[in-house]
């Protein structure tokens, strides 16, 4: 199992951030000899219906496409660019459509995501059926991560995220399966121990870690464990809850989608 096709996004209005935005998708494309496609559109346009680009925006998109193609070509990568003018639907829908026929999306962001970025991330994760790697701009992955922390709660979303991350897990020097033991009750056969056995059969080097949630949230505890173990990436399932449920009980998924990231997180729903 590998990544044969990787999808990413470039905002043509942020040319100074292009190098950071493409660092991880290009590094992964190089590592897996994958084809990489960049969808190019202003992030703020995710809030609006598709319209013909004006001359200024069109020029920026052309420049972004040329710069991406030149960088990919220098690295010997099979690549493609698609601009907003080729989309028949909104940007979130268009990204999800393209992602369904890709193996992985890599989206790089700076700080806490705005509404437009949240819409794009939400569509990518919940409408595509494919894994999505969210990467903080300040902490891109220049290579395949060597230590990965997997959040395991025995949910369908969690196992989909793990299978989506298998090409990375198989290459990592160590994968840590972490269960927050006082978050959800797991039946026999659902524990992280069984999961370590499955991943070992796939050739992964794994170990199990039981965590106590404590007074903070689940994501907070997982990020603390990632820091303690020097993990370079977190893998977790994404679950869509109602706004009221998020407000009253909180949600690790909602925290990921609304807060600034401190390390790359791969999600799948």
Question: Which residues does each PLM region occupy?
Answer:
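Small/aliphatic-rich secondary-structure junction motif
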Residues: 1-55, 127, 144-211, 231
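Gly/Ser-rich helix-loop-strand patches that form or flank binding pockets
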Residues: 18, 22, 29, 94-141, ...
């Amino acid at each position: 199992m590998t990544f044969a096709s990787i999808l990413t996004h470039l905002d043509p209005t942020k040319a100074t951030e292009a190098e950071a935005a493409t660092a991880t998708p290009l590094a992964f494309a190089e590592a897996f000899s994958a084809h990489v496609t960049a969808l190019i559109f202003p992030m703020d346009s995710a809030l609006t219906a598709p319209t013909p680009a004006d001359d200024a925006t069109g020029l920026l998109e052309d420049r972004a496409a040329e710069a991406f193609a030149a960088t990919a070509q220098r690295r010997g990568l099979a690549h493609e660019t698609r601009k907003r003018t080729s989309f028949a639907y909104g940007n979130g829908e268009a990204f999800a459509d393209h992602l369904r026929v890709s193996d992985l999306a890599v989206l790089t962001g700076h700080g806490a995501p705005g509404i437009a970025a949240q819409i794009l991330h939400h569509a990518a994760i919940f409408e595509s059926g494919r894994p999505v790697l969210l990467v903080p701009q300040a902490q891109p992955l220049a290579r395949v991560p060597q230590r990965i922390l997997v959040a395991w709660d025995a949910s369908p979303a969690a196992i989909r995220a793990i299978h989506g991350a298998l090409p990375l897990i198989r290459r990592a020097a160590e994968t840590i399966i972490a269960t927050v033991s006082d978050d959800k009750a797991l039946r026999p056969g659902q524990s992280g121990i069984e999961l370590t056995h499955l991943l070992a059969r796939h050739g992964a080097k794994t170990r199990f870690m039981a965590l106590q949630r404590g007074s903070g949230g689940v994501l907070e505890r997982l990020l603390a464990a990632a820091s303690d173990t020097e993990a370079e990436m977190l893998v977790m399932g994404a679950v869509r809850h109602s706004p009221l449920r998020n407000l009253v009980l909180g949600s690790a998924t909602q925290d990921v989608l609304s807060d600034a990231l401190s390390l790359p997180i791969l999600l799948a729903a």
